[in-house]
């Protein structure tokens, strides 16, 4: 993100939506190339979901993060609860010896029914001396937003809403690194807080109301990581302890009478301890052996009107081993993870059905390297997805009126995934692949009829199969001026050439009681370096319509929009300035038929916006300053696996 001006302009969520293959929707959440995503930040589970996760990513400035890693074939070293894929948002940047700092700022503007503004500021300060290194990153985001939504059936408008939002978001991240000869200790503390207000005018069959919602969320995260190193550089032993807490309060009040409509909240506490050991030895040509154990516990308590109506506990114990080997042009990965789950709790009226289960999750990959940087890869892994606390929460932390409600389900059961993938990749940019994911007991959000209205619920679906095809094709414009032979020499910097990148994906969801068709997804991104080294980037997303996406048939293309960005660096490349316009033609909207009902859902956000963003690396006067590894990300990848993702 930090080097891609079209991605780091705006919020993290706006940048993620531009990634080929990543789908974000109001009704179905986030998926990447047909795989359910688990969201990590700095290699640690974020542990927030649904509308809280969306709000968090919309509030986090994209120019405050370094990169996004998407792991499409998570091996045994990753928790089996990762589902099908992991997205890791890395906020940290490289520390430098002696004091250095980076300042980031952004502003954007929209005008629909009225003018609205967004602005963010962040500062990263880091330094290193002979005893320890440290980093501090802090920032804020002010976000005004607009949304209109519509629920209707064939003859009646059930609910027509306009929402005027004002969100305030603050974050503070610290990192300390202590070196003890070969060993090191990393200490991290993160704090984020958001205060979101919304004015909601709604009308529909039999009602008209004007409400105000307040949503306050605080998140604390502490991590300790001790990295033991040996004379044998391939031998590594890591110990990590992580504590994460989330507190959320949601209130909805009528603006006319002042009466309370909703008074809900929850408290969540998550502990995790893990240790990992790895070592290389001579077998075939080179083999790496990894093993480790993990224990974590989640405590979740939901309140309604000050009374606890869900008390939920989950404990996980796991152990894994994995081998990565290479022999001539072949690479192999074989691993397995054993996980044990204990889930219990109670609502205000009854005890939850206890869940005690131990499962084994194998994974295997084989890769054939045709020539350097060109390979064929086949992968299988079994994963599980435990119901997240947003889906379990029986209380409404979204919005409701007399005709529209949102419900969680405390009795949801885990989902088991069998994931298969085959891929051909060349030079990191071209790829063609097919994947299949078979899910048993899939947790799914559905819109159903509820009396004379509509309700959003979560439930288990016995069997879901997702077929996914992907193609990524880079087209350097020099191909037309210098020919194929010169282009294939790859004697150039990709960031400094003119090119077009095309992505095509096809996804089909097969459900037991739905007969639907698949969806095609398209993305085109072009970079042109203009005179004075001004970088112009254009990005276009769209999809076909009429296909089923789980229990929804899309009436409008997913995230259809055209964005442009102009970027230039100044002051010896220390100052980066970008000017952008997102959704120029104002085409980004959502529209779905809720299958099995006669309900239609439509929504439109203020997606057309113009803005400017800047990053200024305050130069150090000390010529001895040099970069060190980042320390806000406490799970540093020190080596690459035998098989790339």
Predicted regions and their residues:
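Surface-exposed extracellular loop regions of Gram-negative outer-membrane beta-barrel proteins
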Residues: 91-107, 145-148, 190-203, 241-242, ...
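Transmembrane beta-strands of outer-membrane beta-barrel pores
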Residues: 105-111, 129, 140-144, 180, ...
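Outer membrane beta-barrel strand-and-loop segments of large Gram-negative receptors
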Residues: 270-274, 413, 431-502, 513
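Outer-membrane beta-barrel signature, preferentially recognizing the C-terminal barrel domain
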Residues: 219, 354-355, 374, 384-440, ...
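Conserved C-terminal beta-signal and adjacent last beta-strands/turns
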Residues: 321, 516-645
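N-terminal periplasmic accessory domains that precede
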Residues: 12-15, 53-57, 69-70, 82-107, ...
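Flexible loop and strand-edge segments within Gram-negative outer membrane beta-barrel domains
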Residues: 112, 143-270, 312, 385, ...
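Extracytoplasmic beta-strand/coil segments of soluble accessory domains associated
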Residues: 13-49, 85
């Amino acid at each position: 993100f930090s080097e891609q001006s079209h991605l780091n302009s705006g919020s993290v969520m706006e940048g993620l939506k531009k990634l080929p293959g990543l789908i974000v929707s109001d009704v179905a959440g986030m998926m990447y190339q047909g795989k359910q995503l688990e969201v990590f930040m700095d290699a640690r589970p974020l542990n927030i979901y649904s509308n809280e996760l969306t709000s968090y990513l919309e509030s986090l400035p994209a120019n405050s993060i370094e990169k996004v890693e998407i792991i499409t074939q998570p091996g045994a070293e990753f928790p089996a609860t990762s589902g099908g894929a992991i997205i890791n948002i890395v906020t940290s940047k490289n520390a430098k010896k002696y004091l250095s700092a980076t300042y980031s700022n952004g502003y954007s503007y929209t005008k629909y029914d009225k003018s609205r503004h967004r602005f963010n500021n962040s500062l990263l300060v880091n330094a290193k001396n002979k005893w320890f290194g440290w980093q501090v990153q802090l920032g804020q985001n002010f976000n005004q937003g607009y949304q209109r939504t519509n629920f209707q059936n064939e003859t009646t408008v059930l609910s027509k809403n306009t929402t005027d939002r004002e969100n305030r978001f603050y974050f503070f991240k610290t990192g300390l690194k202590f070196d003890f000869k070969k060993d090191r200790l990393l200490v991290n503390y993160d704090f984020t807080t958001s205060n979101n207000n919304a004015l909601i005018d709604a009308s529909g069959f039999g009602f008209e109301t004007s409400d105000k919602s307040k949503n306050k969320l605080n998140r604390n995260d502490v991590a300790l990581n001790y990295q033991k190193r040996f004379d044998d550089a391939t031998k590594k032993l890591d110990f990590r302890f992580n504590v994460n807490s989330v507190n959320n309060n949601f209130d909805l009040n009528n603006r006319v009478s002042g009466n309370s409509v909703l008074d809900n909240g929850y408290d969540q506490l998550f502990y995790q301890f893990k240790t990992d050991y790895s070592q290389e030895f001579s077998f075939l040509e080179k083999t790496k052996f990894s093993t480790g154990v993990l224990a974590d516990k989640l405590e979740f308590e939901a309140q309604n009107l000050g009374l606890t109506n869900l008390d939920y506990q989950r404990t996980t114990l796991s152990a894994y081993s994995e081998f990565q080997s290479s022999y001539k042009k072949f690479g192999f990965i074989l691993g397995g993870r054993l996980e044990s789950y204990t889930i219990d709790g109670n609502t205000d009226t009854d005890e939850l059905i206890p869940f005690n289960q131990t499962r084994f999750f194998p994974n295997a990959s084989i890769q054939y390297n045709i020539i350097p940087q060109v390979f064929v890869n086949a992968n299988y892994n079994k994963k599980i997805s435990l119901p997240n606390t947003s889906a379990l929460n029986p209380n409404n932390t979204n919005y409701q009126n007399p005709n529209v409600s949102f419900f969680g389900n405390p009795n949801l059961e885990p989902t088991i995934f069998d994931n298969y993938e085959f891929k051909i990749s060349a030079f990191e940019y071209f790829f063609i692949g097919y994947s299949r994911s078979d899910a048993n007991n899939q947790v799914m959000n559905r819109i159903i009829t509820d009396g004379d209205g509509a309700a959003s619920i979560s439930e288990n679906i016995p069997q879901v199969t997702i077929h996914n095809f992907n193609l990524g094709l880079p087209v350097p414009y020099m191909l037309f001026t210098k020919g194929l032979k010169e282009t294939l020499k790859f004697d150039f910097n990709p960031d400094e050439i003119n090119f077009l990148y095309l992505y095509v994906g096809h996804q089909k969801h097969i459900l037991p009681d739905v007969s639907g068709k698949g969806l095609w997804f398209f993305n085109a991104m072009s970079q042109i370096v203009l005179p004075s080294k001004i970088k112009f980037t254009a990005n276009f997303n769209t999809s076909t319509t009429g296909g089923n996406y789980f229990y929804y048939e899309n009436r409008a293309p997913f995230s259809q929009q055209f964005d442009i960005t102009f970027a230039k660096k100044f002051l010896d490349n220390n100052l980066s300035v970008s000017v952008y316009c997102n959704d120029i033609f104002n085409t980004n909207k959502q529209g779905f038929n809720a299958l099995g009902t006669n309900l239609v859902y439509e929504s439109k956000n203020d997606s057309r916006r113009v803005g400017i963003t800047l990053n200024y690396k305050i130069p150090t006067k000390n010529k001895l300053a040099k970069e060190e590894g980042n320390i806000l990300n406490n799970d540093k990848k020190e080596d690459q696996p035998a098989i790339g993702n």
